[in-house]
Protein backbone atom coordinates (compact mmCIF):
# COMPACT_ATOMS: atom_id res chain seq x y z
CA UNK A 1 0.00 0.00 0.00
CA UNK A 2 2.83 2.37 0.90
CA UNK A 3 4.61 1.71 -2.42
CA UNK A 4 1.37 2.29 -4.32
CA UNK A 5 0.82 5.66 -2.63
CA UNK A 6 4.43 6.62 -3.31
CA UNK A 7 3.93 5.76 -6.96
CA UNK A 8 0.83 7.98 -7.12
CA UNK A 9 2.77 10.72 -5.31
CA UNK A 10 5.43 10.66 -8.05
CA UNK A 11 2.78 10.54 -10.79
CA UNK A 12 1.24 13.76 -9.49
CA UNK A 13 4.62 15.49 -9.17
CA UNK A 14 5.67 14.41 -12.65
CA UNK A 15 2.41 15.56 -14.26
CA UNK A 16 2.48 18.99 -12.59
CA UNK A 17 6.20 19.45 -13.26
CA UNK A 18 5.80 18.71 -16.97
CA UNK A 19 2.39 20.21 -17.70
CA UNK A 20 2.14 23.04 -15.18
CA UNK A 21 -1.08 23.78 -13.32
CA UNK A 22 -4.08 21.43 -13.36
CA UNK A 23 -7.36 20.95 -11.56
CA UNK A 24 -7.91 18.07 -9.16
CA UNK A 25 -10.60 16.64 -11.44
CA UNK A 26 -8.23 16.72 -14.43
CA UNK A 27 -5.52 14.95 -12.45
CA UNK A 28 -7.92 12.33 -11.09
CA UNK A 29 -9.10 11.50 -14.61
CA UNK A 30 -5.69 11.49 -16.34
CA UNK A 31 -3.81 9.62 -13.61
CA UNK A 32 -6.70 7.30 -12.69
CA UNK A 33 -6.48 8.20 -9.00
CA UNK A 34 -9.66 8.35 -6.89
CA UNK A 35 -10.48 11.97 -6.05
CA UNK A 36 -10.46 11.46 -2.23
CA UNK A 37 -7.01 9.83 -2.41
CA UNK A 38 -5.75 12.56 -4.73
CA UNK A 39 -7.05 15.30 -2.42
CA UNK A 40 -5.17 13.83 0.53
CA UNK A 41 -1.96 13.50 -1.50
CA UNK A 42 -2.21 17.05 -2.78
CA UNK A 43 -2.83 18.38 0.74
CA UNK A 44 0.36 16.67 1.91
CA UNK A 45 2.31 18.06 -1.05
CA UNK A 46 1.03 21.58 -0.37
CA UNK A 47 2.21 21.28 3.24
CA UNK A 48 5.61 20.10 1.96
CA UNK A 49 5.72 23.15 -0.34
CA UNK A 50 6.00 20.98 -3.43
CA UNK A 51 2.66 22.21 -4.80
CA UNK A 52 0.64 25.36 -4.27
CA UNK A 53 -3.06 26.06 -4.62
CA UNK A 54 -4.04 28.68 -7.19
CA UNK A 55 -7.62 28.40 -5.99
CA UNK A 56 -9.78 25.72 -4.40
CA UNK A 57 -9.69 23.44 -7.46
CA UNK A 58 -6.41 24.21 -9.28
CA UNK A 59 -2.84 23.43 -8.20
CA UNK A 60 0.57 24.38 -9.62
CA UNK A 61 4.28 23.72 -8.95
CA UNK A 62 5.57 25.42 -5.80
CA UNK A 63 9.16 26.64 -5.26
CA UNK A 64 9.87 23.45 -3.30
CA UNK A 65 9.10 21.28 -6.33
CA UNK A 66 11.10 23.53 -8.61
CA UNK A 67 14.13 23.31 -6.32
CA UNK A 68 13.72 19.64 -5.51
CA UNK A 69 13.76 18.43 -9.06
CA UNK A 70 14.59 21.49 -11.18
CA UNK A 71 11.15 20.87 -12.66
CA UNK A 72 10.28 24.46 -13.48
CA UNK A 73 9.34 25.62 -16.98
CA UNK A 74 13.09 26.02 -17.49
CA UNK A 75 13.44 22.23 -17.75
CA UNK A 76 9.96 21.19 -18.89
CA UNK A 77 11.26 20.82 -22.47
CA UNK A 78 13.80 18.29 -21.24
CA UNK A 79 11.17 16.29 -19.37
CA UNK A 80 8.64 16.36 -22.23
CA UNK A 81 11.25 14.92 -24.59
CA UNK A 82 12.91 12.44 -22.24
CA UNK A 83 10.10 10.94 -20.16
CA UNK A 84 8.02 9.30 -22.96
CA UNK A 85 11.16 7.72 -24.45
CA UNK A 86 12.30 6.45 -21.04
CA UNK A 87 8.90 5.03 -20.18
CA UNK A 88 8.58 3.28 -23.55
CA UNK A 89 12.07 1.76 -23.31
CA UNK A 90 11.55 0.66 -19.69
CA UNK A 91 8.25 -1.05 -20.52
CA UNK A 92 9.74 -2.74 -23.57
CA UNK A 93 12.72 -4.11 -21.62
CA UNK A 94 10.76 -4.70 -18.41
CA UNK A 95 13.39 -2.78 -16.44
CA UNK A 96 13.32 0.18 -14.07
CA UNK A 97 14.76 3.54 -15.04
CA UNK A 98 16.07 6.57 -13.17
CA UNK A 99 16.55 10.00 -14.73
CA UNK A 100 18.53 12.45 -12.57
CA UNK A 101 20.40 15.74 -12.72
CA UNK A 102 23.19 17.50 -10.83
CA UNK A 103 23.03 21.17 -9.80
CA UNK A 104 26.71 21.44 -8.88
CA UNK A 105 26.12 20.35 -5.30
CA UNK A 106 23.32 17.80 -5.14
CA UNK A 107 21.98 14.94 -7.23
CA UNK A 108 18.20 15.20 -7.74
CA UNK A 109 15.79 12.78 -9.35
CA UNK A 110 13.75 14.07 -12.30
CA UNK A 111 11.83 10.91 -13.21
CA UNK A 112 11.77 7.20 -12.42
CA UNK A 113 9.81 4.08 -13.30
CA UNK A 114 9.23 1.19 -10.93
CA UNK A 115 8.06 -2.20 -12.16
CA UNK A 116 6.74 -4.62 -9.48
CA UNK A 117 9.34 -7.29 -10.30
CA UNK A 118 12.28 -4.88 -9.99
CA UNK A 119 13.01 -3.55 -6.51
CA UNK A 120 13.56 0.24 -6.73
CA UNK A 121 16.98 1.63 -5.78
CA UNK A 122 18.36 5.13 -5.21
CA UNK A 123 20.57 7.11 -7.59
CA UNK A 124 23.52 6.12 -5.41
CA UNK A 125 22.68 2.43 -5.19
CA UNK A 126 22.19 2.26 -8.96
CA UNK A 127 25.60 3.81 -9.68
CA UNK A 128 24.01 6.73 -11.54
CA UNK A 129 25.13 9.41 -9.07
CA UNK A 130 28.91 8.87 -9.47
CA UNK A 131 28.49 8.69 -13.26
CA UNK A 132 26.78 12.09 -13.33
CA UNK A 133 29.17 13.71 -10.84
CA UNK A 134 32.24 12.38 -12.65
CA UNK A 135 30.91 13.76 -15.94
CA UNK A 136 30.43 17.11 -14.17
CA UNK A 137 34.11 17.15 -13.15
CA UNK A 138 33.65 16.38 -9.45
CA UNK A 139 36.71 14.81 -7.80
CA UNK A 140 36.81 11.19 -6.66
CA UNK A 141 37.27 12.38 -3.08
CA UNK A 142 34.07 14.44 -3.15
CA UNK A 143 32.17 11.60 -4.85
CA UNK A 144 33.33 9.24 -2.11
CA UNK A 145 32.36 11.71 0.61
CA UNK A 146 28.85 12.05 -0.79
CA UNK A 147 28.59 8.27 -1.24
CA UNK A 148 29.30 7.75 2.46
CA UNK A 149 26.87 10.54 3.35
CA UNK A 150 24.03 9.23 1.19
CA UNK A 151 24.51 5.52 1.94
CA UNK A 152 25.08 5.48 5.72
CA UNK A 153 24.69 1.70 5.91
CA UNK A 154 27.49 0.99 3.44
CA UNK A 155 30.26 -1.36 4.56
CA UNK A 156 33.99 -0.99 3.92
CA UNK A 157 33.58 -3.57 1.16
CA UNK A 158 30.96 -1.31 -0.46
CA UNK A 159 33.40 1.61 -0.26
CA UNK A 160 36.15 -0.42 -1.95
CA UNK A 161 33.76 -1.44 -4.73
CA UNK A 162 32.69 2.19 -5.14
CA UNK A 163 36.32 3.33 -5.42
CA UNK A 164 37.01 0.73 -8.12
CA UNK A 165 33.88 1.81 -9.98
CA UNK A 166 34.99 5.44 -9.86
CA UNK A 167 38.25 4.47 -11.57
CA UNK A 168 36.30 2.58 -14.23
CA UNK A 169 33.92 5.52 -14.75
CA UNK A 170 36.86 7.89 -15.28
CA UNK A 171 37.98 5.72 -18.19
CA UNK A 172 34.66 4.54 -19.64
CA UNK A 173 32.50 7.63 -18.83
CA UNK A 174 29.63 5.28 -17.93
CA UNK A 175 28.97 2.26 -15.70
CA UNK A 176 27.61 -1.17 -16.57
CA UNK A 177 27.05 -3.58 -13.68
CA UNK A 178 26.13 -7.23 -14.12
CA UNK A 179 25.76 -10.19 -11.74
CA UNK A 180 25.67 -13.95 -12.13
CA UNK A 181 21.88 -13.74 -11.67
CA UNK A 182 21.67 -11.59 -14.84
CA UNK A 183 20.81 -8.42 -12.99
CA UNK A 184 22.01 -5.51 -15.11
CA UNK A 185 22.45 -1.81 -14.44
CA UNK A 186 23.55 0.63 -17.15
CA UNK A 187 24.18 4.32 -16.23
CA UNK A 188 25.05 6.93 -18.89
CA UNK A 189 25.52 10.74 -18.54
CA UNK A 190 24.62 13.60 -20.89
CA UNK A 191 24.51 17.41 -20.73
CA UNK A 192 21.49 19.68 -20.93
CA UNK A 193 22.30 23.39 -21.08
CA UNK A 194 24.65 23.90 -18.12
CA UNK A 195 23.28 20.91 -16.22
CA UNK A 196 24.80 17.44 -16.19
CA UNK A 197 22.16 14.68 -16.31
CA UNK A 198 22.18 10.92 -16.43
CA UNK A 199 19.93 7.94 -17.12
CA UNK A 200 20.12 4.47 -15.61
CA UNK A 201 18.23 1.30 -16.54
CA UNK A 202 18.35 -1.58 -14.09
CA UNK A 203 16.68 -4.87 -13.23
CA UNK A 204 16.45 -8.42 -14.55
CA UNK A 205 18.28 -8.65 -17.87
CA UNK A 206 15.98 -8.78 -20.92
CA UNK A 207 15.54 -12.22 -22.48
CA UNK A 208 17.52 -13.02 -25.63
CA UNK A 209 19.64 -9.90 -25.21
CA UNK A 210 23.41 -9.74 -24.82
CA UNK A 211 25.14 -7.24 -22.59
CA UNK A 212 26.78 -5.61 -25.62
CA UNK A 213 23.44 -5.20 -27.41
CA UNK A 214 21.74 -3.77 -24.33
CA UNK A 215 24.62 -1.36 -23.68
CA UNK A 216 24.39 -0.15 -27.28
CA UNK A 217 20.60 0.27 -27.10
CA UNK A 218 20.88 2.31 -23.90
CA UNK A 219 23.62 4.49 -25.38
CA UNK A 220 21.61 5.12 -28.54
CA UNK A 221 18.52 6.08 -26.52
CA UNK A 222 20.47 8.55 -24.38
CA UNK A 223 22.06 9.99 -27.54
CA UNK A 224 18.61 10.50 -29.10
CA UNK A 225 17.37 12.28 -25.98
CA UNK A 226 20.49 14.46 -25.82
CA UNK A 227 20.18 15.32 -29.52
CA UNK A 228 16.49 16.19 -29.18
CA UNK A 229 16.96 18.54 -26.24
CA UNK A 230 20.05 20.17 -27.79
CA UNK A 231 17.80 21.45 -30.59
CA UNK A 232 15.64 23.42 -28.12
Where are these regions (language model features)?
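Short strand-connecting beta-turns/loops that link adjacent beta-strands
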Residues: 56, 104-105, 193
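Short, structured helix-loop boundary elements
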Residues: 3-6, 62, 75, 79, ...
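Extended hydrophobic
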Residues: 155-229
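N-terminal helix-turn-helix
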Residues: 1-72, 227, 231
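Short amphipathic alpha-helical signal-transduction/dimerization elements
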Residues: 17, 137, 141-145, 219-231
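Short loop/turn microsegments at loop-to-beta-strand junctions
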Residues: 56, 97, 128, 184-186
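Conserved beta-strand cores of small sensory beta-sandwich domains that regulate signal transduction
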Residues: 52, 98-100, 174-177
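Amphipathic alpha-helical effector-binding/dimerization core
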Residues: 63-150
